[in-house]
Structure formats: C-alpha cells, structure tokens
Design a protein with these regions (language model features):
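Short, intrinsically disordered or compositionally biased N-terminal tails of bacterial proteins
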Residues: 1-16
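Short, hydrophobic-biased segments on the C-terminal half of alpha helices
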Residues: 60-61
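Short acidic, hydrophobic short linear motifs in intrinsically disordered regions
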Residues: 36-46
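Mid-protein regulatory/catalytic core that forms ligand/cofactor-binding pockets
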Residues: 7-10, 120-231
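Basic, amphipathic "hinge/linker" alpha-helix immediately C-terminal to the N-terminal HTH DNA-binding motif
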Residues: 75-94
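Key DNA-contact positions within bacterial/archaeal DNA-binding proteins
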Residues: 54
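A short, conserved structural fragment
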Residues: 64-72
Length: 240
C-alpha cells in the first residue's frame, strides 16, 4: 500500500460526525498531563480544552461509569487499565498522523498538530499498523515527544521544565508540550527562529514572561521571543 493509498483510505473512512470524539480527547488529555508532570484534575482539562466546568464534570462522570477512570479522593483523575490502553492508542495515532503529515505530505510544522487532532479519531487500526511500518524508526513526534510503545526510548526520555532552568546557560530544546503545540501562531514564531527540538536555546525571566533565545553554534543570539511563564512550563530542555 502506497502512502497516498494510506492517506486516501484514512480520509475515506472519516465521517465528519466522528472527527471529534470527546471521550478519546479527554483520555489523551489526561495522558498528556501526566507526560508533562501535571496532576490530572478536572480543572486542568478545563484549562487545556476550554470546556466549561459542568461539561467536564459530566463527561468525567460518564467516563468513570464506563470504567475508563477513577476520580480519587484528592480529585486526581486516574486512568483504569482499560482507559490507559485506549488513551495510549489515541495518542499513538495522533503522533503517527503528525509524522505522516510533516514527513510525507509536507505540511507546515506549525500546523500538523492541529490537523492530527482530527485524524486521531478516525484512523483505523489497519492504517495505524501500516503507518508504523512505513514510518519505522520514528520514536518521537515532530515536537520531540515520545511515540507510545517505542522501546528505543525506554529510560531515555528525561528533560527539565524550562522554568526550572532559567539562567542555566546554554540548553538544548528537548520537547514542546501540548499547550504550545495547540497555538499555531506561536509555533510558527518558534519555527521562524529555528526553535524546534534539538535547537540550542538560552532562557531568562523578565517579570511574568520568559525570553526564549535561539542560539547559533557560537552561542550568539539569532533572535528571541517572549512567552508567558505559564506557557514556558510546557517547554522541556536538556543541559549541554
């Protein structure tokens, strides 16, 4: 099956009414919160997805009845074995779609996350399996985040929050969290400065914002942008 056929089949199977699956979206969000070191709470889902508090509470209650998660005594959301398996599957499809969109179709780096949010809900298991073959040796998504199930990353995916690394000197941008991925305009600004995973960066705090500088091989600043401290918490870096 050619890559064009994979794309055609995926789109043919997509029903517009099924492009967004709320349960899958919530499961993936909980998994992403865990990945970013954020305690999964209903309030955090409100922040991430922009849904109202009552809507999130109703959806979470339904998911608990369906055996996908538990609401713990401290309000933390804990995925059940079934819920985690489903969440992992959705996240893997999302990140495979991102790689296909960027590496094969040639979509702009700043736009592939938003587009993949639609694809993750309509990709069949057969298409997923074929993409895994066609995109072999792909263990991270375009934003440096791990591909679920990639054994090559076992024990190697550690990075530090950018806000904990202020004034730490020259660093390497390791990965970019979902809240920044969801901002297409901000991602485009990152791209213009070459601020992709693997780039050399310098960080400094200025009040309630963080300056993220793009550095050349000599450590000279090529350009920079400023982002709110809250967003900087979703940049992950490594020391050189």
């Amino acid at each position: 099956m050619t890559l064009f056929c994979v794309y055609y089949r995926l789109m043919k199977e997509a029903d517009v009414a099924d492009l967004i699956d709320t349960t899958e979206m919530y499961l993936k969000t909980i998994l992403e919160l865990e990945e970013d070191g954020v305690t999964p709470l209903r309030a955090r889902i409100v922040d991430r997805l922009g849904h109202s508090g009552p809507t999130v509470s109703q959806t979470v209650a339904r998911m608990e009845r369906d055996g996908l998660l538990h609401v713990m005594g401290d309000r933390r959301l804990e995925l059940t074995e079934t819920g985690r398996a489903h969440a992992t599957e959705v996240l893997r499809k999302h990140r495979l779609a991102e790689r296909l969109l960027l590496d094969v179709i040639g979509m702009d780096w700043a736009q592939v996350h938003d587009e993949a949010c639609r694809w993750e809900h309509v990709m069949s298991d057969a298409v997923e399996a074929r993409l895994e073959e066609l995109l072999s040796n792909t263990c991270v998504d375009p934003y440096g985040n791990p591909m679920p199930g990639c054994e090559q990353l076992q024990g190697t995916h550690s990075a530090e929050l950018a806000v904990r690394s202020l004034e730490a000197g020259t660093l390497t941008l390791a990965r970019i969290g979902e809240p920044i991925q969801a901002d297409t305009e901000l991602l485009a600004s990152f791209d213009e400065l070459g601020l992709r995973p693997g780039a050399r960066v310098g960080l400094s705090a200025h009040g309630d914002v963080v300056r993220v500088a793009s550095l050349d091989e000599a450590g000279e600043v090529r350009g920079y942008l400023t982002i709110p401290m809250a967003l900087a918490a979703h940049l992950f870096v490594r020391g050189e």
